[in-house]
């Protein structure tokens, strides 16, 4: 994995000339840039420090009008080369670029004092002292300050030495294995088709692989790859990459989108961000402020919502919800920059702590968990994200972007949490997990729901799984309800009998008139045997209405006394068991059974035989083929 160095500094301080002197590569690719002598777009170069180590260099524009491009380039760098012209010293974009680098989480770098051939030695010493003083307290405090001249070559070898030394301190596996490439250019190349370019943030991309453009959702395959202008089989994190895509038109793509492997990024219209307002900001950031929001290669208008305050004062840090006009993809730990409208300047920056946020009320109970996400790592971070997700749970793919964990580490951590009974996989198809604290809360709520149901429906044994899902489980993943029920049944907190769920202490409570009705109905249907009365006949004979008996029919079915064969007929279970027994005995010596065979077997008239045969088919005891029936294997 290459190390990436980015330049920073004021316009016309010699960043591009210095890179050309170091590498021989002119980073100004636009005719306008070469004519005007300023960098507008990002420039890219490389320097082979050793046969094994190639340094990628991103040359960012210094003009204040092109700060959005500077942010795009700085997002993927490991360390910064702050360029300050000896004849001018520290200037406005010097300050803004350093602040942006700090907000983007860059924690290492060095300084080049350029144009030293244009100043006297004593002036150079004064500028050196000024820079040292300015950098005190910043991440560049104590960093090497190297006087150089791109014109004469003075100091270049010394600068290369410091760059090589700093590059050697970065671990090769410092980035995750989730491939992402923010698109900064889209164009058509004659004979090749659509090409996108960008700098890979993490992971790797190979020829022929399928990719997804996020958030648009377009799919394509990698037709060709170039890394630093050379054809390649694979592009890795930190490399300047051009990707030739199959079957996509330029109009279908735009700067700011992200290339990724399919179903690895999940756009959201809300991000939770740990936001810091710059100490140098002239004003606080107010709740509901609309801002220019920069992330990767995208600039978009967004609104900031503070959950525990009305404004964020300069120098303060707080959790903030960033809400976008459309869903965008992010990953835990990604850095972002906020610029004000008027004047247009950098005022804040932040770090994504939840890329799958959801709108919450101010002073929400989620604030306690959100406030811990910035410093959380490993198991603690995983559990916090599962807690925020609540009853919906999270898939492994979602947890990957919510923790930025390398895939093998994530799988191992989930196994450890499962062993500790702190996280549970309730959907093996989607690999979806829920936290133990969420599950415990749901278990308590489910027991309360069942208790309330028993109080409301004293004549019912309980309720079915389907009723529990449509009632208590509304808005929950159905598989989570099943998982929860299994745990409650296994622990003995809930009883499951004939698909009816009830609390252990619940018994059906009947008033005296209901007890009499129960006896009447049970006696009538049991004594009727294989030819019970129709529902209508039973009601008329006993002066009852359908409303009078609805609950009792349901209770007797739950208790296993009656079986509903059709809207017209209920059978005593003992009678139906007798019919099923006769049918099974018949098939011990016969391959098929016709309607007349069944009537002869049961002595039922057509009025009873047809609904009973249809019931046997529905219960998968028999199978109808034409006008015959065959027995189903148990």
Curated annotation (Swiss-Prot):
Principal location: cytoplasm
Leader sequence residues: none
Keywords: Cytoplasm, GTP-binding, Nucleotide-binding, Protein biosynthesis
G1, as annotated region: 9-16
Family the UniProt entry places it in: Belongs to the TRAFAC class translation factor GTPase superfamily. Classic translation factor GTPase family. SelB subfamily.
Role noted for this protein: Translation factor necessary for the incorporation of selenocysteine into proteins. It probably replaces EF-Tu for the insertion of selenocysteine directed by the UGA codon. SelB binds GTP and GDP.
Protein name: Selenocysteine-specific elongation factor
């Amino acid at each position: 994995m290459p190390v990436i160095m980015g330049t920073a500094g004021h316009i016309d301080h010699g960043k591009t000339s210095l890179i050309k002197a170091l590498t021989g590569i002119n980073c100004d690719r636009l005719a306008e840039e070469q004519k005007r002598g300023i960098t507008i777009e990002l420039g890219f170069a490389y320097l082979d420090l050793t046969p094994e180590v190639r340094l990628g260099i991103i040359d960012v524009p210094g003009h204040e009008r092109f700060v959005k491009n500077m942010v795009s380039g700085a997002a993927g760098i490991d360390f910064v080369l702050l360029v300050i012209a000896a004849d001018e010293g520290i200037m406005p974009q010097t300050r803004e670029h350093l602040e942006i680098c700090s907000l983007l989480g860059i924690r290492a770098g060095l300084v080049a004092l350029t144009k030293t051939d244009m100043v006297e030695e004593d002036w150079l010493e004064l500028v050196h002292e000024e820079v040292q003083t300015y950098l005190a307290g910043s991440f560049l405090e104590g960093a090497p300050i190297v006087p150089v001249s791109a014109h004469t070559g003075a100091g270049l070898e010394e600068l290369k030495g410091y760059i090589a030394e700093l590059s050697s301190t970065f671990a090769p596996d410092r980035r995750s294995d989730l491939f992402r490439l923010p698109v900064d250019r889209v164009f058509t190349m004659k004979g090749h088709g659509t090409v996108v370019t960008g700098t890979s943030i993490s992971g790797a991309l190979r020829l022929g692989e399928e990719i997804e453009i996020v958030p648009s959702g377009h799919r394509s395959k990698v037709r060709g790859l170039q890394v630093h202008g050379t054809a390649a089989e694979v592009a890795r994190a930190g490399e300047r990459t051009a990707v030739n895509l199959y079957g996509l038109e330029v109009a279908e793509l735009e700067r700011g989108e992200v290339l990724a492997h399919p179903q690895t990024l999940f756009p959201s219209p809300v991000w939770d961000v740990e936001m810091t307002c710059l100490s140098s900001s002239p004003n606080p950031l107010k709740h509901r402020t609309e801002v220019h929001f920069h992330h990767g290669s995208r600039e978009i208008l967004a609104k900031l919502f503070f959950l525990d305050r009305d404004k964020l004062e300069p120098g303060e840090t707080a959790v903030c919800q960033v809400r976008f006009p459309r869903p965008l993809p992010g990953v835990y730990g990604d850095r972002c920059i906020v610029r004000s409208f008027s004047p247009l300047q950098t005022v804040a920056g932040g770090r994504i702590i939840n890329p799958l946020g959801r709108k919450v009320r101010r002073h929400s109970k989620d604030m306690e968990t959100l406030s811990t996400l910035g410093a959380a790592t490993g198991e603690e971070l995983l559990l916090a994200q599962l807690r925020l997700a609540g009853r919906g749970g999270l898939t492994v793919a979602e947890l990957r972007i919510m923790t930025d964990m390398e895939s093998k580490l994530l799988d191992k951590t989930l196994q450890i949490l499962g062993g500790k009974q702190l996280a549970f996989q309730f959907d093996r198809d989607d690999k979806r997990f829920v936290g133990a604290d969420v599950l415990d809360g749901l278990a308590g709520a489910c027991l309360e729901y069942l208790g309330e149901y028993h109080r409301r429906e004293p004549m019912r044994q309980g309720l079915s799984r389907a009723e529990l899902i449509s009632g208590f489980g509304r808005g929950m993943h159905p598989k989570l309800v099943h998982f929860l029920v299994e745990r409650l049944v296994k622990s003995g907190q809930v009883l499951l009998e004939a698909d009816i769920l009830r609390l252990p202490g619940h018994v059906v409570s009947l008033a005296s008139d209901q007890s009499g009705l129960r006896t009447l109905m049970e006696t009538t249907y049991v004594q009727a045997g294989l030819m019970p009365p129709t529902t209508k006949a039973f009601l008329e004979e006993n002066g009852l209405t359908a409303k009078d008996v609805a609950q009792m029919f349901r209770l007797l079915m739950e208790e296993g006394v009656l079986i509903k064969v059709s809207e017209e007929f209920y059978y005593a279970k003992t009678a139906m068991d007798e019919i099923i027994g006769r049918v099974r005995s018949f098939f011990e010596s016969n391959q098929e059974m016709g309607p007349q065979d069944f009537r002869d077997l049961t002595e039922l008239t057509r009025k009873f035989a047809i609904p009973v045969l249809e019931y046997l088919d529905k219960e998968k005891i028999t199978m109808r083929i034409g006008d015959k029936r065959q027995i189903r294997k148990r």
